[in-house]
Amino acid sequence: TQRKLAVPSYQEFYAGHMHQEIAQFIGKDQKDYRVVSIGMHPAITQYNGFYTLDAYVGNYPLEYKHEFRKVMIAELDKSPFYRDYFDHLGGSRCYLFVEKLMYNAMMTKDHNIVIEELALDSAQLKKMGGHYVFSALEIQNSQDIGLKLLKVFEEPDSAWRIYLYEVS
């Protein structure tokens, strides 16, 4: 069966087998490290047993929101929409917003998009306990911002192509 663009089945969306492969590749107990997602909902990694710094959550400390904002402050500065959304409207959505994606957390492998220049503060991400970035898109300036590409994961039964970056 051919699936429709950006309309994955339940199995394709959560991609359990692929996330098991990622966990095995990392080779540590999932409780011992934290991840963030780009271009895909953090609920996917949470569902698969990963501990995330990003989430869709109703209540969390305002201090945490301010610390998380520092990770992507330069990215928010590129987009008045995202800045306003994160600061004033989308309090429950503690996501890494990327200006190029324009509110799309469904960057399935059908999309042929790359992130040329991500403005991410990896030192702040690391300070918050972030160890890995699960990105649905290639980040071309990854080395410049302190991210090391470890491996690209893709499977026929997954909606995603996941670029696994380590925060260095």
In which residue ranges do the predicted regions lie?
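Generic structural signal for short, flexible, solvent-exposed coil/loop and linker residues
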Residues: Q11, G39-H41, V114, S122, ...
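Extracytoplasmic/lumenal acceptor-recognition loop(s) of multi-pass membrane glycoenzymes
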Residues: K4, G39-N112
